[in-house]
């Protein structure tokens, strides 16, 4: 139940992100995963503003949903997760990666990366991004500087 619901709900923050900032880029706006948790579970200041009870009445799944959604786009999972929390986080992260790969197969690169094919072909992969790729792990968002760094970053998700 929690895995299915987290898959349905994890990107609700994207709608607010595009409304507020006119972009899906977390680097250029706000962390959409954190925004999703605020929309669903409220804020520290006001948990009553969350909308999760409009979707599921049983609060016993909340901790798994909250953590899976909050950390689905994090570079690394926090080490203090319980085994069950970690499992739900990994399920959602893997499903999200599969969706990213699907989008990259079905959508023109110009639309995904908001640049021209020529710019992508001429851009160079920065040394930090190349190093992360060679080390066979995901690329930290802050390291991506050129348009092609984003492509390499998506490919590197395979290693995680």
Describe each PLM feature range.
Residues 1-25, 36, 40, 65-75:
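His-Asp-centered metal-binding catalytic motifs of divalent-metal-dependent phosphohydrolases/nucleases
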Residues 20-34, 110-113:
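Post-HEXXH active-site segment of zinc metalloproteases
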Residues 1, 9, 20, 74-160:
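Divalent metal-dependent phosphate-bond-processing catalytic cores, especially two-metal-ion Mg2+/Mn2+ enzymes
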Residues 1-5, 47-70, 85-91:
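Acidic/histidine metal-binding catalytic segments
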Residues 30-48:
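An active-site-proximal "capping" alpha-helix that borders the catalytic cofactor pocket
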